[in-house]
Amino acid sequence: MVTKPDWLRVKAPQRERVGAVKDILRDLALNTVCEEASCPNIGECFKAGTATFLIMGPACTRACPYCDIDFEKYPKALDPTEPERLAQAVRRMGLRHVVITSVNRDDLADGGALQFARCIEAVRRVMPQTTIEVLIPDFCGSEAALDIVIAAHPQVINHNTETVPRLYRRVRPQGDYGRTLQLLERVRAKASHIYTKSGLMAGLGESEAEVLAVMADLRAVYCDILTIGQYLQPTPKHLKVEAFVEPALFERWRRAGEGMGFLQMVSSPLTRSSYHAEQVQRLMRSHPRTPKNQHSPE
């Protein structure tokens, strides 16, 4: 059994620090990936008044062996009031940047793309100055579904790569590495004003060279932002941690990513795809993009 090193130990969140955020979420009957996926940074993020909202219910139609979100083949129908409730949470929390993600909903014809668009539009009506990041599923490769999200014009579209190609069958059996790259490439080709983002987990048996190869593949499709963090086994029934990656290697990946041209490169043991996502606002100021002033791929 691999022993968790000291650099991965975080203080348990205290009620007074996270209570206000939890009260808002409970009052508005909203889910967060922070809670559903047992994120180790929940205390820090809730203390700062930030959260990553999980839309379309707490149950997923896929059963990825690394993920702590519950599986259901046929989850509940979508709630038409969810977009407005989410927007009210953003208002009550005073968020300048919001991250919206979802479970996979392969039971829906559009994979939930329209619900993403409705949530984006609701937040924009209530908090027009808030920047919006969406962390989306692959929609089973549907270009039409992706177009629905793009048409809502979030500032950032994130789709996580999760692991290296060699490990996809074991780690992400219902995903496809090529489909992930194609999704990111399509976003950039159709709406170059939208920043694209992806994330990787380390410690599942990948090599340093394999991670660098994935980073190069992501830059080849003009991915702007990359996060890399340590995989942590949520429960004994989930995939085991093969290795706890030293902080020095995360730092090497960070420097390598900057050298490859990622506009933002976040790599550390506790990094998660939405960790300190609000920092993307600095990137937007230094590399501004608007629909009327689209940038060609670098």
Curated annotation (Swiss-Prot):
Q: Give the molecular function GO annotations.
A: 4 iron, 4 sulfur cluster binding; lipoate synthase activity; metal ion binding
SUPFAM superfamilies for this protein: Radical SAM enzymes
- Broad EC category: transferase
- The answer to whether UniProt assigns keyword Zinc to this entry is no
The record lists the catalysed reaction(s) as: [[Fe-S] cluster scaffold protein carrying a second [4Fe-4S](2+) cluster] + N(6)-octanoyl-L-lysyl-[protein] + 2 oxidized [2Fe-2S]-[ferredoxin] + 2 S-adenosyl-L-methionine + 4 H(+) = [[Fe-S] cluster scaffold protein] + N(6)-[(R)-dihydrolipoyl]-L-lysyl-[protein] + 4 Fe(3+) + 2 hydrogen sulfide + 2 5'-deoxyadenosine + 2 L-methionine + 2 reduced [2Fe-2S]-[ferredoxin]
Cofactor binding, note field? Binds 2 [4Fe-4S] clusters per subunit. One cluster is coordinated with 3 cysteines and an exchangeable S-adenosyl-L-methionine.
E.C. no: 2.8.1.8
Q: Which PROSITE patterns match?
A: RADICAL_SAM
One Pfam family here: Radical_SAM
User: What pathway or pathways are given for this protein in its record?
Assistant: Protein modification; protein lipoylation via endogenous pathway; protein N(6)-(lipoyl)lysine from octanoyl-[acyl-carrier-protein]: step 2/2
- Keywords from the UniProt entry: 4Fe-4S, Cytoplasm, Iron, Iron-sulfur, Metal-binding, S-adenosyl-L-methionine, Transferase
Q: Does the keyword Cytoplasm apply?
A: yes
What family does the Swiss-Prot or TrEMBL record give for this protein?
Answer: Belongs to the radical SAM superfamily. Lipoyl synthase family.
HAMAP family to which the protein is assigned, alphabetical: Lipoyl_synth
Please state what the protein is called: Lipoyl synthase 1
- Organism lineage: Bacteria, Bacillati, Cyanobacteriota, Cyanophyceae, Gloeobacterales
